[in-house]
């Protein structure tokens, strides 16, 4: 999901999950891509999503344009929930799954490395091509107690927890504060990627994962 906070109004380009009524909405599917566009209170948000050929990554290019006559200060928040590599097990084996989640944050890149140290040679990552103003990797910190995806605490308050998940439900969210003059447009590339590392190259130092494959992939896409 991508959340937009414009003043006191929170909305999504694709309507869900907040379900704020939009002034306009469109969804277009082409050959290998989808463009979702929403408009609310003079702000247009467009999400171009595609999987580039030959890489294990999904790209979401988010464009914000101020169509009003006044400057706007908005907050763009991304969100993905990481799986634990087995969809069936994710939904059933809670007594184990809630103890294994592990992440690492480096700049604007959030690495999901659950079980990488113990028995896996692959990890996932979620990145954006701009410095971030905050992040979260722990679901409860992001949503807030008893909240759902329609009203995440971090989005509605505009304050991320900069949480580092240790077990429970690992996820990734970036907060980007954007100032737009009338008519100005800004574009951001979010990349959700997956890499596999040869067993002998898993670590570059004790307990330090090999991030080189992820960084090489990001150089191509951002």
What role is predicted for each listed range?
Residues 1-222:
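Anionic coordination/interaction segments
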């Amino acid at each position: 999901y991508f959340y937009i906070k414009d003043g006191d109004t929170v909305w999504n380009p694709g309507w869900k999950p907040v379900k704020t009524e939009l002034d306009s909405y469109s969804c277009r599917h082409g050959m290998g891509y989808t463009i979702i566009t929403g408009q609310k209170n003079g702000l247009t948000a467009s999400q171009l999503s595609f999987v580039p050929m030959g890489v294990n990554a999904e790209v979401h290019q988010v464009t914000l344009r101020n169509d009003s006559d006044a400057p706007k200060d908005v907050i763009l928040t991304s969100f993905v929930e990481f799986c634990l590599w087995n969809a069936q097990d994710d939904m059933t084996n809670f007594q184990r799954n809630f103890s294994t989640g592990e992440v690492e944050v480096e700049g604007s890149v959030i690495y999901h490395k659950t079980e990488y140290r113990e028995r896996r040679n692959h990890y996932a990552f979620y990145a954006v091509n701009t410095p971030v103003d905050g992040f979260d990797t722990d679901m409860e910190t992001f949503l807030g107690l008893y909240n759902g995806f329609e009203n995440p605490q971090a989005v509605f308050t505009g304050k991320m927890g900069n949480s580092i998940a240790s077990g429970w439900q690992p996820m990734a969210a970036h907060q980007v504060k954007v100032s737009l003059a009338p008519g100005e447009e800004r574009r951001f590339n979010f990349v959700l990627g997956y890499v596999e590392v040869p067993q002998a190259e898993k670590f570059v130092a004790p307990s330090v994962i090999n991030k080189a494959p992820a960084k090489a992939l990001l150089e191509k896409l951002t």
